[in-house]
């Protein structure tokens, strides 16, 4: 295997394969082994683990994960990177490279197929590692959570501002629908900040590594999860409006007067704003909406 730990190594690999970093895919390759080893430590990998890595790039993190885990499935969307990735990981017999878009891949099915059913839906939980570009972070995390893929934890690199959103508290500027979804399903923790200088090419912003440990059960109990998230999205749809106006304008439910009654039943002031509500308050609104005949 090739140790990808400097700009010179990245440039040489790309020169040999006639490729260059694609800005449209957010390709900034992590080249600091100290940071990589901290990510591996955070994932607490053992030979019993299956790791699914999303966006392996040139394989710097993949190689380190392969040294600890039983098997690594590296899912890469960029077909042009695959020969370079294969070269870097040559000799790593427990790594399998899969060309695929993380927004489409059925990770549970993939895990099951590659482990004869030992992992994935109906099997053991696996671990996810990812260095996520900004454009992909929200949609992918929501998909992974809402589709209930059978992972035990995720350790992800995200832009620093996104890390703040994942862990934000009600009443703060960073708190939003993504915060609610992540905190509903997982216990998120920002582990450490990552300067832009440890990537090649360096991005325009700093990043952070976040650990998302799946909760044994969601943070709050709701009668209908789909309705809960519909209410959350509606409440954050118009951040400058009051909660009542946001819900009434969302198209969800029969109208303003009905929403006023729903909020009254839930014990929520209609003049509040969505970003001030806790998960339990969103749950109360969703259940009250169902009591009023919503669906």
Curated annotation (Swiss-Prot):
EC id: 2.1.1.182
Keyword RNA-binding tagged: yes
Molecular-function annotations in GO: 16S rRNA (adenine(1518)-N(6)/adenine(1519)-N(6))-dimethyltransferase activity; RNA binding
Taxonomy, superkingdom: Bacteria
Catalytic activity of the protein: adenosine(1518)/adenosine(1519) in 16S rRNA + 4 S-adenosyl-L-methionine = N(6)-dimethyladenosine(1518)/N(6)-dimethyladenosine(1519) in 16S rRNA + 4 S-adenosyl-L-homocysteine + 4 H(+)
InterPro entries in alphabetical order: KsgA/Erm, rRNA_Ade_diMease-like_C, rRNA_Ade_Mease_Trfase_CS, rRNA_Ade_methylase_Trfase_N, rRNA_adenine_dimethylase, SAM-dependent_MTases_sf
Record's subcellular location: Cytoplasm
Secretion signal span: none
Residue positions binding S-adenosyl-L-methionine: 28, 30, 55, 76, 101, 131
Transmembrane segments: none
Matches recorded under PROSITE patterns: RRNA_A_DIMETH (PS01131), SAM_RNA_A_N6_MT (PS51689)
The keyword Methyltransferase appears for this protein: yes
Main EC class the enzyme belongs to: transferase
GO cellular component labels: cytosol
UniProt KW keywords: Cytoplasm, Methyltransferase, RNA-binding, rRNA processing, S-adenosyl-L-methionine, Transferase
Family: Belongs to the class I-like SAM-binding methyltransferase superfamily. rRNA adenine N(6)-methyltransferase family. RsmA subfamily.
Stated role: Specifically dimethylates two adjacent adenosines (A1518 and A1519) in the loop of a conserved hairpin near the 3'-end of 16S rRNA in the 30S particle. May play a critical role in biogenesis of 30S subunits.
NCBIfam families hit by this protein: ksgA
UniProt xrefs under HAMAP family: 16SrRNA_methyltr_A
Name the record gives this protein: Ribosomal RNA small subunit methyltransferase A
Organism of provenance: Pelotomaculum thermopropionicum (strain DSM 13744 / JCM 10971 / SI)
Lineage summary: Bacteria, Bacillati, Bacillota, Clostridia, Eubacteriales
